[in-house]
């Protein structure tokens, strides 16, 4: 047993200090990034926000909508190969280039992944996702997928420390997904006592990834546009959002009526709800590590994504960053004990 004495920080522990700026308007800020990925050699440009690979968030409808904003969607893994075929046939290359194909790590998952990728040469992104990215099995699976699909852009996770980021990049991942337990419907930290404050995880993992020419996705923990900006400021190349994009008409969640109001079911992918739906219930040897909530129906996701991007643009103007790429260099975090004045309720 050992104890690390360094304080680790989440988004609520800091604010970004403002700096002098020559920008006259938020409209001058460019949120598009261009990346050339280490192993695949592919180049992608767009707004590096990703809808999380949850079946009550990342539907085909969500992918089609967010692509119009140059934003990515990690489409959840529970669509069939046939459903993927129908989706691919109905969409343009521009939409498909903003889609990640999600995969588990079983032999069946590998076969399914290959069949989906064969549907279109415009499906370039793979999201290999398991809750515990510290498994040797994940590293072996990344190697296997890299060998089978050398031209694909592979993201893999989830992890929270630099050593495992390096391991996954060396094994063949272009991008590593960072975050254990910060999500709004994740209870891993409560059930297991395992986790890492998300901002510190992003800062440390970004340093490790960038040293090897890789990228990271900050996955989880964002509850407002300011948190998204803090994730980018901390060094995240991409930011993945679940709860912030749930509850919309494109999210795919079950709509129910409660007290005369339309509500949308949103749940973690290790929750009782998810395992009942996809695995025949919670296995006797494990515990559910997610919760199920009902969210007020939010309408179209277009309004929400515009609000998020508007907030990040505003952050950039406050620190003098003309582009999202400059935000990390212009960010100075200050530790705080308060975030906002809640006398009239939270925003």
Curated annotation (Swiss-Prot):
Give the active-site positions: 186
Q: Which reaction is the catalytic activity of this chain?
A: IMP + NH4(+) + NADP(+) = GMP + NADPH + 2 H(+)
Which GO terms fall under molecular function for this chain's record?
Answer: GMP reductase activity; metal ion binding
Q: What is its EC number?
A: 1.7.1.7
Q: Enzyme group, top EC level?
A: oxidoreductase
Cross-referenced InterPro entries:
Aldolase_TIM (IPR013785), GMP_reductase (IPR050139), GMPR (IPR005993), IMP_DH/GMP_Rdtase_CS (IPR015875), IMP_DH_GMPRt (IPR001093)
Asked whether the UniProt record includes NADP among its keywords, one would answer yes
Q: Which domain of life is it from?
A: Bacteria
Q: Does the keyword Oxidoreductase apply?
A: yes
Binding site residues for K(+): 181, 183
PANTHER family in the record? GMP REDUCTASE
Q: Quote the function comment for this protein.
A: Catalyzes the irreversible NADPH-dependent deamination of GMP to IMP. It functions in the conversion of nucleobase, nucleoside and nucleotide derivatives of G to A nucleotides, and in maintaining the intracellular balance of A and G nucleotides.
On assembly, the entry states: Homotetramer.
Could you tell me what this protein is called? GMP reductase
Origin species, per record, is Shewanella pealeana (strain ATCC 700345 / ANG-SQ1)
